[in-house]
Regions:
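Active-site and donor-binding regions of nucleotide-sugar-utilizing enzymes
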Residues: 4, 8-11, 15-26, 66-123
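Conserved nucleotide-sugar phosphate-binding/catalytic loop shared by glycosyltransferases and other
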Residues: 33-76, 86
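Structural signal for hydrophobic packing residues in well-ordered secondary-structure cores
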Residues: 25-29, 57
Length: 123
């Protein structure tokens, strides 16, 4: 049985670093990859990197509603809550064996906290 891996990416910075590993996992018969995208990838301001992701021809892409917000405390906390809610919905409807996350921003912290709550190992 294939191991189901979710790779979370929210910006060009983490996607660029993980691009090769995403490609390898997606083309390895031992794994079933879901590339979970959100936040800046669909933003014109940040270059709509969603197009670059689509060009990789990843077999399974799931877009979550992580919409970039203004960087003030209240908006960031509302955004953080939205990210947790969206990640919970994803885990409720997808059986995932492990999650790959990379980043030093609050987006990945929200995803990591959700993984911990769902007992999903983080790679």
């Amino acid at each position: 049985m294939k191991k189901k891996i979710a790779v979370f990416t929210v910006a060009r910075s983490d996607f660029g670093i993980m691009k090769n590993i995403i490609h390898r996992i997606d083309n390895d018969d031992r794994f079933e990859l879901t590339c979970v995208i959100g936040a800046a990838h669909d933003s014109k301001i940040f270059g709509q990197t969603i197009n670059e992701i689509k060009e990789m021809k990843i077999k399974k892409i799931k877009k979550l509603k992580f919409n970039y917000v203004k960087s003030d405390s209240k908006n960031i906390m509302n955004y953080f809550q939205m990210m947790i809610d969206e990640t919970c919905k994803f885990f409720d409807t997808n059986k995932i064996d492990a999650a790959l996350i990379l980043g030093d921003r609050y987006e990945m912290m929200a995803i990591a906290l959700t993984c911990i709550n769902y007992n999903i190992p983080i790679m």
